[in-house]
Amino acid sequence: MKRFFQPVAKDGSPSKKRQAAAAEPEGGPASAGAATGGDGEGRPAEEPRKFLTWNANSLLLRMKSDWPAFSQLVARLDPDVICVQVVLRALSTSPFKDYRVWWSLSDSKYAGTAMFIKKKFEPKKVSFNLDRTSSKHETDGRVIIAEFESFLLLNTYAPNNGWKEEENSFQRRRKWDKRMLEFVQHVDKPLIWCGDLNVSHEEIDVSHPDFFSSAKLNGYTPPNQEDCGQPGFTPAERRRFGNILFQGKLVDAYRHLHKEKDMDGGFSWSGHPIGNEINFSAYSSRYRGKRMRIDYFLVSEQLKDRIVSCEMHGRGIELDGFYGSDHCPVTLELSKAVAEAAPEQPKP
């Protein structure tokens, strides 16, 4: 197991210095070249249709303790792409032999994302910045974008809004949301956006709306009412997220299929907020059974009719199916794209 826990540099070699990495340990360039575009017989190239996203809350820790169970889930679901958030550090060898992996990391053991893509699928390009023309990675390794022939796949780990404006977290989140809005307004292909988006859009997306709406840290109340409440459930965040969906013409795949509130399996996060100012025992008890849906698959409206399933894989307040994280995996499956119909032959 030790061989997995080595940071990798941009060329894929182990490195003691932490840095953003775009490594494919199984060989091949960091950013894939042009796809073949077909099978040689005029048919379009096969593209991924089954996706899994998971905030692992440290991939290293999950591999040490919960990996066999998670590996069984992956084997059973057989996703074409696995998107992971909060990896903290890269692994020198991919834990999934049939997948190639791309990493984007922070300079410290914080945040970071990974994207595992089955080797039979060839992305045209992989980027690590919302500005896809930039060669730089996003701060803290929060973005990976894989471009396929007919769509873009975006994996993000959104910054937490935090509790206090004085810590600049509100401003950081506002800037992030502004950049995401600009991105979705200008994408040139249908989009599949997944990851820990750190926001619950509607009251149906949290287990206890009144609790989260009135949540405070050590009694502190932000001066702006729009910033009050649990990070991820403040009026300002929810409003901005709704605008991103509207302006980007995006569909929440899970809510598209699941219209009713599911108190057992309709949430992706459960736990207590982490912070130096929080008394762990008091807050862990207070937050027991309090859950939020903050992990998503959002798809462009052009893809809405292809949604086959979108499921949460965690259940109950005992966090069955969370695999040691405070987030559970979420999956999306699309149907095959309908080939363009052949022109009707004129009748004799």
Which residue ranges define each predicted feature?
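Short acidic-hydrophobic surface loop/beta-edge motif
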Residues: 44, 144-148, 332
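Metal-dependent phosphoester-hydrolase catalytic domains
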Residues: 1-16, 20-27, 126-127, 202-348
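Surface-exposed cleft-lining segments at the edges of enzyme active sites
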Residues: 130-136, 158-180, 225-230
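Structured beta-strand-rich core segments of catalytic domains in phosphoester-bond hydrolases
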Residues: 86-165
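Active-site beta-strand/loop signature of hydrolases that rely on acidic residues for catalysis
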Residues: 51-56, 70-90, 153, 184-204, ...
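Structural motif corresponding to alpha-helix initiation and N-cap regions
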Residues: 64-68, 140, 238
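N-terminal, active-site-proximal structural segment of metallo-dependent hydrolase catalytic domains
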Residues: 1-95, 100-113, 336-348
